[in-house]
């Protein structure tokens, strides 16, 4: 195994023309590592469309009287015209409908989370030990194929559909967690923010597209086609993934010598070798790791609240109909998709030009993202009379929140690249924990008092996010921790 000193020595032996070629790979987007970011962008896009498609399709899948009663309970002004369109569409498309109670619908929508909560840590460990190519690829393939079979499973019975969704949740975690083991091998430190944010922006784009097109697909083609279309897109992504993606640049058959050398030399100071053992005791005692964990939980509390209740807030408080609610709910994700990439580019620019240190960049982007996004949400209850002002605040909150993806949310790769897959799995558990608790608490507040409930929801989410920020600012670091380095042995 090559050490950092060996790699430095080899770098010194590189001829000047090769060094010039190597320098050229520091600029531009025509490289295999950026190609990997684009493919992962498509993978994340596919996974998030598959996560959200049932939320839209279930309105058309259930008996219209059940759907109508749910709609009347969740909005102040039921959009009767939109409901008539749904009824006409169901009759014309002849898609099957089911007499699922609200309780069964809730279990179906939650079943994906059951699998997602179980799988992250073992998935991250397996990806870190055996490599991420087949972990991510198989996860995407399984999730996509199961998406295609959802209409058949629904016909077979609700129990089979629940089991299918649990397995699908586990498969999706394989993609969302395992990909970070790839970045530990492929992302030079000075490009880490932009590469990861390009890939992560696929989740925003997927959410945006489902919010925009999900209802239209169900209306025009029938609800089964929302599963056929997005499941088919996922299968198509697998055709790109397996032949083009490799676990590391050393084994990639199509990479140029210059790019391989640039990535290898850039990562020479970091120990990215795969390891079987986990320094659990050292991890538990590591305050920089706890800073990331706490920040993850608190930031996802705010994010989960916004994602879960933005459509409800727009429909009930702003009294938008179904069509307008979908379009307006998609706007924050559209702008967030763009700004998450711009934030990554800005972070890497500040680092490559040595304007700021890496730890300063991580703390600065996290602080701006948390303070601005949470602060903008606080006045929402007082501007509810203006739809344009409310939407402007929601969009701005999403824009600033995207900066955290270049801050605390990728900081674990800085402190322990060797255990990137395992740590991402651990952090996913805390994010799912926040995602399970936050909407429940928000629902309790809103049910108690519709006017002051929203105010309490936003204040609580902002307060939790700021507390997490303070903990992160105090204890976070950006250098590789001692427990994340490969042990060295002295031979006498």
Swiss-Prot record:
Glycans are attached at residues 18, 44, 53, 63, 72, 87. SUPFAM superfamilies: MFS general substrate transporter. It catalyses: 3 Na(+)(out) + phosphate(out) = 3 Na(+)(in) + phosphate(in); urate(out) + n chloride(in) = urate(in) + n chloride(out); L-thyroxine(out) = L-thyroxine(in); 3,3',5-triiodo-L-thyronine(out) = 3,3',5-triiodo-L-thyronine(in). Residues 1-20 are annotated as: Disordered. Gene3D superfamilies: MFS general substrate transporter like domains. Belongs to the major facilitator superfamily. Sodium/anion cotransporter family. This is Probable small intestine urate exporter. It comes from Mus musculus (Mouse).
